[in-house]
């Protein structure tokens, strides 16, 4: 799932990539479901989610150029950029974290 909510229609202009209201709605639902499960399953089970930003997978050049211009780190993520935070959330290092959505988007959602 990409970012917190993909609502920048300009990114998808002149590409064959979609930007559906259904995607944005499902991401919001997933974030709320994370909080619900964390509340329902605590204290024995921790529940967290991630919101990765755009992961580069040979998207159209126009999309990539627009995306990186709005990303504080100036690049799209690779799968490797997502792995570390996921391992952290699955480890005991995050034993006091639950009900959270970790945004891993290189600062895209802050612009």
Task: Please give the residue ranges for each predicted region.
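Catalytic loop of short-chain dehydrogenase/reductase
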Residues: 1-42, 54-55
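Short C-terminal tail/terminal secondary-structure segment
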Residues: 10, 16, 86-87, 98-111
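Short-chain dehydrogenase/reductase
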Residues: 34-35, 83-86, 90
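Conserved functional loop/turn residues at catalytic and ligand-binding sites
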Residues: 37, 75, 92-93, 110
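Short, small/polar-rich loop/turn modules that mediate ligand/substrate recognition or access, typified
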Residues: 42-46, 97-99
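Conserved SDR Rossmann-fold cofactor-binding beta-strand/turn motif
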Residues: 46-56, 90, 103-105
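A short C-terminal helix-loop "cap" of Rossmann-like NAD(P)-dependent dehydrogenase/epimerase domains
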Residues: 58-72, 76
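A conserved structural motif in NAD(P)-dependent oxidoreductases
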Residues: 71-82, 93
